[in-house]
């Protein structure tokens, strides 16, 4: 006979442990327990039945796996936390005894990261445990970069020390330097939250958010303790990643840092890159641009490769012979690129190849750009340098490290301004350094654009037309480059006629006709009112200017405002006019022997265009009804599980189609309104 199982010794009660029990088992404080769980990646768990798991009368809210807590018992950081706890007790006892000198001595041994910025422990082993390979670290770099860039822009407070902010900013600038040298930056997008960046490092897409540069106001209801715990781990992680990235392209890490330039707000210019990956003139070779380090090839293998290249070149120099088919017709090879069409009507839109041989990473290589004071200098400098621009200038008040601080430099080809042009005012005392932006003060031969020109150019991998981005011009919509166009969904870059369905096109045409009829009816009413006014003798005949002046003087002298009786008479006249018009329409309908609605329907039926549209609309309705019936019959052949899954898919697809149709309808109204405004 087996032994009777006791309650709480097996099953769910054994697999879970409460937070209080875990803290007591590890013999550390609750804040240290939170830190340890964040760094080791251990999260609370939700059991299926809390009553079976809880061993106390009170309902516990936080549970952990027992195996996870058992795993934490072997963590080396526990010894550091316990030593710190013992030291804090010794300091409190010394102060209780009144021994200030002993308490001061012990305080010197205590680790105060909020004051020194250097904790008594390191998280290197934790990073190695959580990320066994470098690719794993790259895949988890999104949140790391977003948090570090956020803290780099925060002001120093008691909860966020200045040394922590300085280290975050330095790590972020080092990462930006790698992106500039390797040309790994792919896309960027301006949003309300901040600026999104996307880079491709060793085949992994990394997306992070950078807040705008302005004075942050830190409120008191934010818990910086938890965020600071994440920042400690993320700083160690990004340090590892930067070291690996720099060494992979032959650069020394960390790069030389000039504190003097950093005090002058040089940002990227405060760092000097060194290593075998850089040439003597500071240019980057092709190996760095590809993201790999240089290596000396084998001489024998290189000789074979050179021989093979010569043979290929000699084969290309020979004239291609004409190809004849079975009918004797000759076909000459063409350089046309195949166009990839989707296999199914609802398939994804395929990327088409092009003849473009230009490197997107060198998009601004031939440009010398000057940034005005109101433009976001840090973001623009990073993007322009990442896409090949070597000559970037700005006003000296924005910081050090500019190619030129003279706005009137003749070598400048583009100037980025972010304010509308204003009329220049003569000033005898001297003119400001930004007067070239003013009307009549522009430098001849220079292109003036707004900052959005840079973002749209890098997202489309081509320099956009500067006329659309001129100062004061209405900018084109800034679309997100991270959204991929899918068949059937609304695409703002495609004309409306190419993506709308037949039913939507018919509905749009009918709306246009209704608006035209409404406008025509209003015009007819105005004409009828004018005719009635002439018949009643109320039309004014144009006289001389002297008569008009005399009439105006008499009216000004004798007018004392409208009386209530006159207002009532005017309203009665309007009612009589509208009633007369309605009576005339009814008489015409009586003479023809039909009702008013029937006569209007006959007018529409007499129009061949409206008849064809009505016929087409009926055909579309019949076709949609047949497709729905076929779909219902096909669903009857499915199993219950698959039918439910199919209904869920259909519901989500119909919801997306409705949203796309709503956006297309909104665009149709806007385009119609703009066309009407241009016509008037």
Swiss-Prot record:
Keywords: Coiled coil, Nucleus, Ribosome biogenesis, rRNA processing
rRNA processing found in the keyword field: yes
All copies of domain BRCT, residue ranges: 359-471
Keyword Metal-binding part of the UniProt annotation: no
Primary subcellular site in the record, as a coarse category: nucleus
Region annotation Disordered: where it falls in the sequence: 315-336, 494-680
One example GO MF annotation: RNA binding
GO cellular component term, pick one: nucleoplasm
Single GO BP term: maturation of 5.8S rRNA from tricistronic rRNA transcript (SSU-rRNA, 5.8S rRNA, LSU-rRNA)
Reported function: Component of the NOP7 complex, which is required for maturation of the 25S and 5.8S ribosomal RNAs and formation of the 60S ribosome.
Similarity annotation: Belongs to the pescadillo family.
Assembly and oligomerization: Component of the NOP7 complex, composed of ERB1, NOP7 and YTM1. The complex is held together by ERB1, which interacts with NOP7 via its N-terminal domain and with YTM1 via a high-affinity interaction between the seven-bladed beta-propeller domains of the 2 proteins. The NOP7 complex associates with the 66S pre-ribosome.
Entry protein name: Pescadillo homolog
């Amino acid at each position: 006979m087996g032994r009777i199982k006791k309650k709480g010794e097996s099953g769910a009660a054994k697999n879970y442990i409460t937070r209080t029990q875990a803290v007591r088992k590890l013999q550390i404080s609750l804040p240290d327990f939170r830190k340890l769980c964040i760094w080791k990646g251990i999260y609370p768990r939700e059991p299926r039945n809390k009553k079976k798991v809880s061993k106390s009368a009170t309902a516990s809210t936080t549970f952990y796996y027992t195996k996870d807590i058992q795993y934490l018992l072997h963590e080396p950081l526990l010894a550091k936390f316990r030593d710190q706890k013992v030291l804090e007790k010794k300091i409190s006892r010394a102060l209780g005894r009144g021994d200030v000198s002993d308490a001061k001595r012990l305080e010197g041994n205590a680790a105060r990261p909020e004051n020194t910025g250097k904790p008594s422990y390191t998280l290197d082993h934790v990073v190695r445990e959580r990320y066994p390979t470098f690719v794993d670290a790259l895949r988890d770099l999104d949140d790391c970069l977003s948090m570090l860039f956020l803290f780099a822009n925060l002001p120093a407070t008691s909860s966020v020390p200045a040394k922590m902010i300085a280290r975050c900013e330095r790590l972020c600038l080092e990462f930006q330097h790698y992106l500039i040298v390797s040309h790994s930056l792919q896309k960027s997008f301006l949003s309300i939250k901040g600026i999104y960046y996307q880079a491709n490092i060793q085949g992994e897409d990394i997306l992070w958010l950078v807040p705008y540069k302005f004075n942050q106001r830190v409120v008191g209801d934010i818990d910086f303790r938890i965020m600071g715990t994440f920042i400690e781990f993320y700083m160690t992680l990004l340090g590892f990643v930067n070291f690996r990235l720099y060494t992979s392209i032959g650069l020394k890490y960390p790069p030389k840092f000039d504190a003097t330039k950093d005090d002058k707000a040089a940002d990227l210019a405060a760092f000097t890159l060194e290593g075998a990956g850089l040439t003597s003139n500071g240019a980057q070779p092709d190996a760095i641009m590809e993201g790999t380090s240089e290596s000396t090839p084998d001489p024998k293998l290189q000789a074979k490769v050179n021989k093979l290249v010569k043979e290929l070149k000699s084969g290309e120099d020979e004239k291609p012979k004409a190809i004849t088919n079975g009918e004797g017709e000759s076909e000459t090879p063409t350089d046309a690129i195949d166009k990839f069409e989707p296999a199914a009507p609802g398939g994804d839109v395929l990327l088409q190849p092009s003849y473009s041989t230009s490197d997107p990473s060198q998009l601004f290589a031939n440009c010398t750009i000057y940034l005005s004071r109101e433009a976001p200098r840090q973001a623009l400098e990073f993007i322009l340098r990442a896409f090949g621009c070597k000559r970037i200038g700005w006003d000296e008040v924005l910081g050090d490290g500019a190619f030129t601080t003279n706005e009137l430099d003749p070598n400048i080809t583009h100037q980025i301004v972010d304010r509308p042009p204003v009329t220049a005012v003569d000033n005898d005392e001297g003119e400001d350094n930004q007067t070239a932006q003013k009307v009549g003060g522009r430098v001849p031969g220079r292109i003036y654009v707004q900052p959005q020109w840079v973002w749209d150019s890098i997202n489309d991998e081509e320099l956009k037309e500067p006329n659309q981005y001129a100062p004061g011009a209405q900018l084109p919509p800034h679309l997100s480059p991270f959204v991929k166009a899918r068949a059937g969904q609304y695409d703002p870059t495609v004309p409306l006629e190419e993506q709308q369905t037949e039913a939507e096109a018919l509905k749009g045409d009918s709306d246009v006709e209704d608006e035209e009829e409404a406008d025509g009816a209003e015009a007819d009413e105005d004409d009828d009112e004018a005719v009635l006014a002439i018949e009643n003798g109320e039309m004014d005949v144009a006289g001389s200017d002297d008569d008009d002046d005399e009439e105006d003087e008499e009216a000004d002298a004798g007018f004392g405002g409208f009386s209530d009786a006159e207002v009532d008479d005017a309203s009665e006249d309007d009612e009589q006019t509208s009633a007369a018009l309605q009576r005339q329409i009814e008489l015409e309908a009586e003479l023809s022997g039909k009702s008013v609605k029937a006569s209007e329907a006959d007018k529409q039926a007499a129009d061949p265009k409206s008849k064809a549209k009505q016929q087409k609309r009926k055909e579309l309705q019949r076709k949609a009804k047949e497709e729905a019936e076929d779909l219902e019959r096909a669903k009857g052949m499915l199993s219950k599980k698959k039918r439910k899954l199919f209904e869920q898919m259909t519901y989500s697809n119909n919801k997306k189609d409705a949203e796309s149709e709503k956006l297309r309808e909104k665009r149709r109204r806007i385009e119609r309104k703009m066309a009407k405004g241009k016509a008037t």
